[in-house]
A protein has these predicted regions:
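Short, cationic-aromatic polyanion-contact patches
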Residues: 3-9, 61-80
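Pre-recognition alpha-helix immediately N-terminal to the DNA-recognition helix
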Residues: 8-16, 27, 95
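Short acidic, hydrophobic short linear motifs in intrinsically disordered regions
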Residues: 23-31
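Short helix-coil junctions and helix-kink-helix linkers
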Residues: 30-38
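Short, hydrophobic-biased segments on the C-terminal half of alpha helices
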Residues: 44-48
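Glycine-centered, phosphate/nucleic-acid-interacting loop/turn motifs that mediate DNA/RNA or nucleotide
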Residues: 54
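Short beta-strand "wing" residues that participate in macromolecule-binding interfaces
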Residues: 58
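Amphipathic alpha-helical dimerization/coiled-coil segments
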Residues: 78-124
Length: 127
């Protein structure tokens, strides 16, 4: 499957749908007006374009349509992460992690989570 490349508007819609779906047009209008200040016309135009691109599915629900995501969150996040990593850090995970860890303090839980991830990748037992 081809990597998913989303613009910021598509991220806004999909984040709403990943949290709660299916959603009617009017539910999405309300969600997106509250979240990002969109007008009804912006939401409808974005949904139409996303449906054409295969990013959302629309099914008839009464007099209107109900939308569901056609893209898995993990698939979109993975593609975006790889794109960001390549564009900003020339593909270096170490450089990215170093920059992020230095920029903000990590909690003990976050450090433990990172160690667990590294152990899982390495197949190690944490020793």
């Amino acid at each position: 499957m081809e990597p998913v490349k989303l613009n910021s508007s598509e991220w806004n819609v999909l984040n709403c749908l990943w949290e709660n779906h299916p959603r009617t047009v009017m539910q999405l209008v309300a969600d997106l007006e509250a979240a990002v200040g969109w007008a009804k016309s912006t939401t409808i135009t974005t949904l139409r374009r996303m449906e054409e691109k295969g990013l959302v599915r629309a099914e008839q629900a009464g007099r209107g349509k109900a939308y569901t995501p056609a893209v898995e969150r993990e698939q979109a996040v993975t593609a975006e992460t790889h794109s960001f990593l390549d564009r900003v850090y020339q593909g270096s995970v170490g450089l990215m992690m170093s920059a992020m860890a230095r920029r903000q303090e990590l909690s003990a839980d976050e450090v433990a989570e990172l160690r667990a991830i590294l152990d899982q990748i390495d197949g190690g037992d944490g020793t």
